């Protein structure tokens, strides 16, 4: 069905995808990431602006409006989330499918964001963010029909989106944990922050959907779909590289 994440009308073009092309592209992207990521200051995928850090550290008590604003701001600047969602939406044509997949992602990252911060569940942030980078690689590879073409099977896309959503939320939770938020009004503030994230996500997705809808009307959309997802995959490898180097540098 055309509404599936890997669109049949793209597959019917029988685009020739050579494994060596994917391997070389991934290797080059990962090498560039390793070189760039050696500057540890660039490693934070969920970095918080200096001014925002000051608010998080000094705020005491419930602050619904500011936390909603900061949540929405994070979504607009969270390039890892946006890249993954672009991959998820790339071949979704029906509104019902868009709602389904976005809801699964939202459920996943909302659960781990709240559980991670409110219950203090912790993990190495570099490992979590590397998995987030992997989620971008996965979705681009899925859009290119890589699993069926090269591995002979097709993962459950809905389960994958939900699972990776858990890691995306946990990645944000690890960042907030480092800020030692005040316990006073924490539940209200985290719920407000999460609502803000969802508002920001809706606004960002509206822009993505408008751009994709316009692009799909162009004659060259299907022709350029493979290259677009190859670039998306490269972006995922770069995100992974940042975090892998960060883990190695901090472990040494």
Question: Where are the model-predicted features located?
Answer:
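Histidine-/acidic- and/or cysteine-rich, low-complexity loops and terminal segments associated
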Residues: 16-77, 153, 241-252
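Hydrophobic alpha-helical transmembrane segments in multi-pass membrane proteins
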Residues: 73-79, 84-251
């Amino acid at each position: 069905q055309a509404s599936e994440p890997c669109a049949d009308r793209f597959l019917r073009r029988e685009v020739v995808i050579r494994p060596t092309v994917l391997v070389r592209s991934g290797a080059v992207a990962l090498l560039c990431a390793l070189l760039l990521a050696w500057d540890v200051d660039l490693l934070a995928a969920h970095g918080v602006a200096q001014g925002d850090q000051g608010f998080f550290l000094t705020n005491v008590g419930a602050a619904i409006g500011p936390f909603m604003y900061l949540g929405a701001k994070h979504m607009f600047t969270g390039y890892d989330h946006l890249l993954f969602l672009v991959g998820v939406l790339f071949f979704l044509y029906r509104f019902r499918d868009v709602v389904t997949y976005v809801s699964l992602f939202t459920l996943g990252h909302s659960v781990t964001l709240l559980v991670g911060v409110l219950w203090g569940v912790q993990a190495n942030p570099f490992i979590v963010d590397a998995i987030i980078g992997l989620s971008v690689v996965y979705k681009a590879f899925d859009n290119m029909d890589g699993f069926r073409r090269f591995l002979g099977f097709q993962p459950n896309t809905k389960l994958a989106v939900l699972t990776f959503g858990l890691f995306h939320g946990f990645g944000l939770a690890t960042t907030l944990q480092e800020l030692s938020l005040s316990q006073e009004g924490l539940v209200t503030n985290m719920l407000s922050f999460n609502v803000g994230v969802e508002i920001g996500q809706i606004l960002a997705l509206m822009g993505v959907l408008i751009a994709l809808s316009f692009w799909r009307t162009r004659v060259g959309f299907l022709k350029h779909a493979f290259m677009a997802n190859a670039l998306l995959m490269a972006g995922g490898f770069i995100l992974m590289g940042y975090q892998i180097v960060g883990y190695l540098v901090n472990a040494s």
